[in-house]
Amino acid sequence: QLVVVTSSGTDTLAAEADVYTDRSTFQGYGDAGTLRIDDDAVTLVRFGLDAYAGQAITSATLRLYKLEDYGGATRDIGVYRANQGLDRPLTPPVQGLAAAYPSDDGIAAHPSVLLFADFEDPAFGDAWSVVDHAEHLELVDATEGNGFHELDGQALRVEVGAGDNYGGSLRFRYGDETGSEPDEAWFRYHLLLGDDWLPTDGGKLPGFAGTYGVAGWGGRAVDGTDGWSARGTYKVPVAEGDNPLAGHTSIGSYVYHADMQTSYGDIDLWVDGCAGVLEKGRWYTIETHIRLNTPGVNDGLLEGWVDGRLAYQRTDWRWRDVSTLAVEEVWMNVYHGGTATPPSDLHLYIDNVVIATERIGPMGR
């Protein structure tokens, strides 16, 4: 209950909706008869306050009634205003080297750029060290449909077919293309989710890796000496309904690292400012920056940027205990699952990829 006091009197309101969430699952427990409060649960409660528009509220008191007490421990309960982020004013984007190149024209000539891919050439695969599952990759233009519209000419369509896990995979291997492997790297791509983007499981998106064909993907846990990876990830879209985030897809990082506790990577979502929550049919500028840790020290840096705004930053990663592990490749990987496969075809679109040795940022306008 919420007890609201105004100059007109006192009202006791019942909740319009409530749910608690547990970190162990993306599911919400909105259909439960009670709410739970503990260290791993967040409770959300909504009260209808439209009737008080224009009135001065003297006080508002939240009343919670305890039904059960497990373990006898006391809890400090914090009460906050929930803000999903979509209504926050956007901060100005942070620019990088791309700001000097409207529509990325001429950016390939910049001395810090190692690769620029705009997918205008049917032989686009020649610029990459490895192309896997090429049958899932196709160049498309404005006639595509499916919510697609051109960013800057043609784009690369990636398909995950019904009953399949694989999208496509492009690999830029630093050793093959530049002669050495760095400890720090940047890459940026543009991403649009098609209207048919309805995955039934989370999966993988482009990122960095140093698996060396040994460990760091597919349940091959790492130990600090044999490999690592920091690919992107996506989660199942928010269910349709009375929710401003309905249909949106959260993205983040999927990381195999030396402190991992299971055989599979850990997920960190890019949720700062709600920047890593994507809607279908819109182009986003996605940039990742990695600086590998000092061997044996938890000081590795991983950053994610969306449309030039910092969406994620973590500074305590430990990927390696030996200096022989470096940034082996940019892995433009799209994969559904896990092991679950979608019941229908899914499509996303990629354009204007830049791999560089410094911050790239959004394309110039």
Predicted regions and their residues:
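Extended extracellular/luminal ectodomain segments enriched in beta-structured repeat modules
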Residues: 41-42, 52-62, 180-186
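Exposed beta-strand and adjacent loop surfaces of beta-rich binding modules
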Residues: 59, 74-76, 301
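Low-complexity, Ser/Thr/Pro/Gly-rich disordered linker/stalk regions
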Residues: 88-365
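Sec-exported extracytoplasmic/periplasmic mature domains
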Residues: 62-69, 194, 291
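Flexible, small-residue-rich N-terminal segments that precede or flank a structured functional core
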Residues: 1-52, 65-69, 75-87
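Generic low-polarity alpha-helical segments
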Residues: 1-4, 60, 79, 187, ...
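Extracellular/lumenal ectodomain signal focusing on beta-strand-rich modules
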Residues: 46, 51, 59, 118-121, ...
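A cross-taxa feature marking solvent-exposed loop/turn segments within ectodomains of secreted
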Residues: 55, 70-72, 295-297
